[in-house]
């Protein structure tokens, strides 16, 4: 079970908790990511409406996403709230927890390759990566996308090779895809050939970058759709701007007209090879 590197959660943090015991005035919950730590949820923090019976809302053994509203490390007190967690925050926390579970499983694989137990892996890899990136899976994504060298100086050298093999095969790197349409007309007998040449030149101009993928689709005269996949939205926008400039330049020189029509961005994930 993934655990945090720090000893106590911070106020305002969302945590995964398991209901341990229920009382008329509230409930005690075990903090799954903080071994040995418990929090208390007063009945007034269970729901935004009046709660007559707390058992109508929580049950022993139930896992919930709770918000930390007070922390007193000196007394060991942690106060939690259920009513202050909205659906979007709950979804985001559960996603974060799933990513931590994936990271833990991958780190166990690397530890096995080195013949080390997970406690050693946690101390040498998990803690420094969480401190540097905020979450370990984000570090693995960075390594999968930009090379294991990004982790040099953060974790011991002996971990780099086994981790590199694992993240390149099992880590999904988020990418952004944006799409748009061009309206292009060239009033000449060879207008179609001129348009094709402009699109090919614009595509080949950026496709040398392995992290960028550009695809054109004919939508019916005079429209041509473009899909650009890149590591992030800003890079995709930069590529679209470069391509648009090239297309507009070539078409204008040929005596034609070209207009860029924008659409919405889409986000997807690409599995690394061998996944």
Swiss-Prot record:
Gene3D superfamilies: EIF_2_alpha, Nucleic acid-binding proteins, Translation initiation factor 2, subunit 1, domain 2. One of its GO terms (molecular function) is ribosome binding. Pfam families: EIF_2_alpha (PF07541), S1 (PF00575). Residues 12-83 form the S1 motif domain. PROSITE patterns: S1. InterPro entries: NA-bd_OB-fold (IPR012340), S1_domain (IPR003029), S1_IF2_alpha (IPR044126), TIF2_asu_arc (IPR022964), TIF2_asu_C (IPR024055), TIF2_asu_middle_sf (IPR024054), TIF_2_asu (IPR011488). Keywords: Initiation factor, Protein biosynthesis, RNA-binding. Belongs to the eIF-2-alpha family. eIF-2 functions in the early steps of protein synthesis by forming a ternary complex with GTP and initiator tRNA. Heterotrimer composed of an alpha, a beta and a gamma chain. This is Translation initiation factor 2 subunit alpha.
């Amino acid at each position: 079970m993934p655990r945090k590197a720090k000893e106590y959660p911070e106020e305002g943090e969302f945590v995964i908790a398991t209901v341990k015991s229920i009382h008329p005035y509230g409930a005690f919950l075990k903090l799954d990511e903080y071994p040995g730590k418990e929090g208390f949820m007063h009945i007034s923090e269970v729901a935004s409406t009046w709660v007559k019976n707390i058992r109508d809302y929580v049950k022993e053994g139930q896992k919930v996403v709770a918000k930390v509203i007070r922390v007193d490390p000196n007394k060991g007190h942690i106060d939690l709230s259920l009513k202050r967690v909205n659906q979007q925050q709950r979804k985001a926390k559960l996603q974060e927890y799933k990513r931590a579970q994936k990271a833990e499983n991958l780190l166990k694989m690397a530890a096995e390759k080195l013949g080390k137990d997970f406690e050693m892996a946690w101390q040498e890899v998990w803690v420094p990566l969480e401190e540097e990136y905020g979450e370990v899976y984000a570090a693995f994504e960075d390594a999968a996308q930009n090379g294991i060298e990004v982790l040099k100086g953060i974790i011991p050298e002996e971990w780099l090779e086994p981790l590199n093999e694992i993240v390149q095969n099992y880590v999904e790197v988020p990418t952004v895809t944006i799409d748009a349409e061009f309206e292009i007309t060239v009033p000449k007998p060879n207008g179609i050939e001129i348009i094709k040449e402009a699109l090919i030149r614009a595509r080949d101009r950026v496709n040398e970058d392995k992290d960028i993928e550009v695809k054109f689709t004919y939508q019916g005269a005079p429209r041509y759709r473009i899909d650009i996949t890149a590591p992030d939205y800003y890079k995709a926008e930069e590529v679209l701007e470069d391509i648009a400039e090239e297309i507009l330049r070539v078409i204008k020189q040929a005596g034609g007209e070209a207009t860029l029509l924008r659409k919405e961005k889409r986000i997807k994930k690409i599995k690394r090879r061998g996944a």
